[in-house]
C-alpha cells in the first residue's frame, strides 16, 4: 500500500447527522459510493430516522404482520424486514474494504465487535448468535458475562449451520449491509431508547417471536447523543486496518 493510501486507510471521518430522511440518506450513500475514487476518504454517518419499516433484498411480505400507518420501504441492503425510529442510533460506515485490507466477513465481525464494546461501556454484555447477524443480550441478566450455548462455534467443514436459537435473548442491534465494488454502505442500528411497539407488527429480521429490546428496557439510562458518540468512537477504532 502506498503512503497516501495507507494514510487514507487510517482515517474514518465521523459525521453526526441527527434526524434524517431515510430514503434521502440512502440516495446520498449511493451517490457517495458511486462517486468514490482512490483518493476518497472513508466516512461514518450516524443518524436516526422517523418511524418506518425497511425490507432488505431477502425480505418476504409474510414477515410484515400488520404495518398499519408506518411506511414500508424496499431497500437494497442484505437481510429481512426491520424497523427504524426515533431513539435508535443508526450507523452507516462508507468504507473502501480493498484499501483497508479485509473482507466482508471480517467487516461484519468488526461492526458487531464495535457494538459489543459500546454495550460494555454501559455495563451490558452483548452476544453473537450462530447464524443470526446482530447483537443480543440476556433477558434475565443483561450484565452476565456467561457464554451462550448459542454462540458461534467451530463446525465440521461442510456441515449445515444450525437454526438460530433465541431462547432467553433479546435483540438490541440489527445489521444490514451493502457492498458495491468493494465499497460499503448501509450498516448497523443500535436501539437506545425507543418505542418498541412497532416491532410487534413484524417478524424482526425474519424471525417469528424474536424479542427486541433497547438500552432503556434493560436498565440503561442514556441519551441518543451519548449512545451515538460511544458507538461512533468504537466503530472508528474497530474498523481501522
Curated annotation (Swiss-Prot):
Keyword list, A-Z: Acyltransferase, Cytoplasm, Transferase
CDD domains, A to Z: LipB (cd16444)
Domain of life of the organism encoding this protein: Bacteria
UniProt-recorded Gene Ontology molecular function terms: lipoyl(octanoyl) transferase activity
GO biological process: protein modification process
Residues the UniProt record annotates as site (Lowers pKa of active site Cys): 171
GO cellular component: cytoplasm
Active site annotation, chain numbering: 205
EC number(s) reported in the record: 2.3.1.181
A family per Pfam: LplA-B_cat
Residues covered by the BPL/LPL catalytic domain: 38-241
Main location: cytoplasm
InterPro entries, per the entry: aa-tRNA-synth_II/BPL/LPL, BPL_LPL_catalytic, Octanoyltransferase, Octanoyltransferase_CS
Localisation: Cytoplasm
UniProt record similarity statement: Belongs to the LipB family.
Protein function: Catalyzes the transfer of endogenously produced octanoic acid from octanoyl-acyl-carrier-protein onto the lipoyl domains of lipoate-dependent enzymes. Lipoyl-ACP can also act as a substrate although octanoyl-ACP is likely to be the physiological substrate.
Protein name: Octanoyltransferase
Gene encoding the protein: lipB
Amino acid at each position: 500500500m502506498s503512503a497516501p493510501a495507507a494514510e487514507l486507510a487510517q482515517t474514518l471521518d465521523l459525521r453526526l447527522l441527527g434526524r434524517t430522511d431515510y430514503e434521502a440518506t440512502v440516495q446520498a450513500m449511493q451517490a457517495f459510493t458511486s462517486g468514490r475514487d482512490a483518493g476518497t476518504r472513508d466516512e461514518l454517518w450516524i443518524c436516526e430516522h422517523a418511524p418506518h419499516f425497511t425490507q432488505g433484498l431477502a425480505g418476504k411480505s409474510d414477515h410484515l404482520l400488520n404495518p398499519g400507518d408506518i411506511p414500508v420501504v424496499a431497500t437494497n441492503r442484505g437481510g429481512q424486514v426491520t424497523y427504524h425510529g426515533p431513539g435508535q442510533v443508526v450507523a452507516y460506515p462508507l468504507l473502501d474494504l480493498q484499501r483497508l485490507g479485509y473482507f466482508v466477513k471480517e467487516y461484519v465481525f468488526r461492526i458487531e465487535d464495535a457494538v459489543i464494546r459500546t454495550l460494555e461501556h454501559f455495563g451490558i454484555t452483548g452476544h453473537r448468535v450462530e447464524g443470526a447477524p446482530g447483537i443480543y443480550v440476556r433477558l434475565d441478566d443483561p450484565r452476565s458475562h456467561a457464554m451462550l450455548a448459542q454462540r458461534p462455534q467451530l463446525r465440521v467443514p461442510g456441515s449445515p449451520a444450525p437454526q438460530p436459537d433465541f431462547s432467553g435473548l433479546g435483540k438490541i442491534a440489527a445489521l444490514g449491509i451493502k457492498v458495491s465494488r468493494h465499497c460499503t454502505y448501509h450498516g448497523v442500528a443500535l436501539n437506545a431508547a425507543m418505542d418498541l411497539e412497532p416491532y410487534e407488527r413484524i417478524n424482526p429480521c425474519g424471525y417469528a417471536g424474536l424479542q427486541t429490546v433497547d438500552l432503556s428496557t434493560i436498565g440503561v439510562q442514556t441519551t441518543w447523543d451519548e449512545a451515538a458518540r460511544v458507538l461512533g468512537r468504537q466503530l472508528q477504532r474497530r474498523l481501522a486496518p
